[in-house]
Amino acid sequence: MTHMTKTLLEMSELRSVPCNDAIDLAPMIEEVLTDLAPLAEQKGITLVSKGDAQTIGSDTLIYRLLFNLVENAIRYSAPNSTVQINACAEGDRVLLRVRDQGPGIPEQYQTSIFQPFFRVDKSRSRAYGGVGLGLALVWEIAALHGGSIEVEKSSERGTTMLVTLPTRALGSLK
């Protein structure tokens, strides 16, 4: 089964996944960074995590959300740079920030990148790989958990993606 087919199946089955696990984000972030360390090492990228927070949701889906964001950050970052992920609680929300040192996302595309198959630049997809579903999946997972994702900052020196999740379960979650 191709990577694209697997991702499409994941997206179609999201609503059936129970979302009531208590999740400590620091250990999950460390697991994601460990799993992506070989990819980062190929480019000489340092992975850094800071902070901790707790949320309620699907540990499988939150892992996928974090994995996709960090994997994108590694792919688009310059060699020998740093990818940083921060987690913190702010009131009744959890804020997750993934910062890379890549080419940035032009302002006119900062909402379009969450649409399935959208590409800022076709040459980027050839250079960096992927099928254009990773950020769409992240958007769906965040929304399913009562949260959101946005480009918080972006310039030619890198991008910071911000995911906001509730710290407690929503009545609509399974």
Which role does the model predict for each range below?
Residues 21-34:
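A conserved beta-strand-to-alpha-helix junction within the catalytic ATP-binding
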Residues 100:
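Acidic ATP/Mg2+-coordinating residue in the GHKL
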Residues 80-92:
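Short beta-strand/loop element within the Bergerat-fold HATPase_c
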Residues 73-74:
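Short helix-loop "hinge" at the ATP-lid/N-box region of the Bergerat-fold HATPase_c
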Residues 39-49:
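Short conserved segments within the C-terminal catalytic ATPase subdomain
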Residues 105-119:
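Short conserved segment of the HATPase_c
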